[in-house]
Amino acid sequence: MNLKQMVGIEAAKYVEDGMIVGLGTGSTAKFMVDEIGRRVKEEGLSIVGVTTSKETEKQALALGIPLKSIDEVPYVDLTIDGADEISADFQGIKGGGAALLFEKIVATYSKKCIWIVDKSKMVDDLGAFPLPVEVVPYGSRQLVHLFEEKGYHPTLRLNAAGETLITDGGHHIIDLHLEKITDPEALGSYLDNLVGVVEHGLFLNMVSMVIVGYEDGPKTLHVPAR
């Protein structure tokens, strides 16, 4: 069992009968969704899933997990998702899988969020992983120029075919290569106020628990209340 599978299975233990569960996206979240699907089938676990991408929706439906959209539920009890980086003070960068907008919407309306990662994702400071910024296609080149002038080293994300990537929401992604983010809240606020920016991959003050995979087993970190 690899570290991603280990934390995915561990996180699925927190899912209880009757819950509305946000199902994350990505290589680690995939194992969590598989385990929830197994529990639905083998244990009779009764939940409703809310997916964060078309990719996860397809996986969950194939596993027989009942689904509703975020607009069909009053709230989400628990969201479990991966992360690309988690800092020492439990702030995160997400969006390497291009699902950041829907992931952030589901997380925002969740009572509790668990992030599942292998040990390599735990860092002192955010920024070594490129920061995704989801933008409206119209005017996106202007934002690239703006970010270049700011010294953010932007790149427009491409898909496997080498064409401009289109997100599930119909947007583009500009990745910012920042190396180190000294003030995530200030940067997040700046990006929030830019015309044409739909969302960014800074997930600040959102997570309740982090499950980290190590060779000797998963370690659960409880995030202090903010």
Swiss-Prot record:
Binding-site residues, substrate: T25, G26, S27, T28, D81, G82, A83, D84, K94, G95, G96, G97, K121
The reaction(s) this protein catalyses: aldehydo-D-ribose 5-phosphate = D-ribulose 5-phosphate
Entry-linked Pfam families: Rib_5-P_isom_A
Catalytic EC class: isomerase
Gene Ontology biological process terms in this record: D-ribose metabolic process; pentose-phosphate shunt, non-oxidative branch
Domain of life per record: Bacteria
Keywords from the UniProt entry: Isomerase
Gene Ontology CC: one annotated term: cytosol
Catalytic activity, EC: 5.3.1.6
Gene Ontology molecular function terms on file: ribose-5-phosphate isomerase activity
InterPro entries noted in UniProt: NagB/RpiA_transferase-like (IPR037171), Ribose5P_isomerase_typA_subgr (IPR020672), Ribose5P_isomerase_type_A (IPR004788)
Associated pathway: Carbohydrate degradation; pentose phosphate pathway; D-ribose 5-phosphate from D-ribulose 5-phosphate (non-oxidative stage): step 1/1
Annotated active site: E103 (proton acceptor)
CDD domains registered for this protein in UniProt: RPI_A
Subunit structure: Homodimer.
PANTHER family reported in the protein's UniProt record: RIBOSE-5-PHOSPHATE ISOMERASE
Function (record text): Catalyzes the reversible conversion of ribose-5-phosphate to ribulose 5-phosphate.
Family membership: Belongs to the ribose 5-phosphate isomerase family.
Protein name per UniProt: Ribose-5-phosphate isomerase A
Species this protein is from: Enterococcus faecalis (strain ATCC 700802 / V583)
Lineage, highest ranks first: Bacteria, Bacillati, Bacillota, Bacilli, Lactobacillales
